[in-house]
Amino acid sequence: MTRLKEIYKNEIMAGMQKKFGYKNEMQIPKLDKIVINMGVGEAKDNAKALEAAVKDMEIIAGQKAVITKARKSVANFKLREGVAIGCKVTLRGEKMYEFADRLINLALPRVRDFRGVNPNAFDGRGNYALGVKEQLIFPEIEYDKVDKVRGMDVIFVTTAKTDEEARELLTLFGMPFSK
């Protein structure tokens, strides 16, 4: 069992139950999945850019990335329907907790001028979205092998009903929210 999952079972569940007064332990919010999405705009012209992004994503997430395709044609972006424009990974279970642990304790502290993540990026349904500006903050990525700095979206999907519950859950996991 991963470190973060053990902390959840032993400490977080009890803390959440005490704070919100849940009657049943199945009511206690938990992390459902983490979705990592990387939009690669230049992929429509350059297939190598997408390959590099997929490779980086697989190194960071530890599992195979799915290539995302454009759903609609947009003339202003010179984009046609069905063209590959990015990649994503959905993490669940052990890999999800392992990634969350690495993100919170290793990657985020390596961000330049880091003062915490935005505490207002909840969607109203207990999910949290976080933008990462460069993939170099992850220790698995070798600086010399990076062709271009790319950002990504990391979405924490929880079973929490409200943003307040989700914020408390992520705070107990150690997410460094700015004041």
UniProtKB/Swiss-Prot annotation:
Disulfide bonds: none annotated. One of its GO terms (molecular function) is rRNA binding. The keyword tRNA-binding applies. Coiled coil: none annotated. One of its GO terms (cellular component) is ribosome. Keywords: Ribonucleoprotein, Ribosomal protein, RNA-binding, rRNA-binding, tRNA-binding. GO terms for biological process: translation. InterPro entries: Ribosomal_uL5, Ribosomal_uL5_bac-type, Ribosomal_uL5_C, Ribosomal_uL5_CS, Ribosomal_uL5_dom_sf, Ribosomal_uL5_N. Part of the 50S ribosomal subunit; part of the 5S rRNA/L5/L18/L25 subcomplex. Contacts the 5S rRNA and the P site tRNA. Forms a bridge to the 30S subunit in the 70S ribosome. PANTHER family: 60S RIBOSOMAL PROTEIN L11-RELATED. Belongs to the universal ribosomal protein uL5 family. This is one of the proteins that bind and probably mediate the attachment of the 5S RNA into the large ribosomal subunit, where it forms part of the central protuberance. In the 70S ribosome it contacts protein S13 of the 30S subunit (bridge B1b), connecting the 2 subunits; this bridge is implicated in subunit movement. Contacts the P site tRNA; the 5S rRNA and some of its associated proteins might help stabilize positioning of ribosome-bound tRNAs. This is Large ribosomal subunit protein uL5. It comes from Lachnoclostridium phytofermentans (strain ATCC 700394 / DSM 18823 / ISDg).
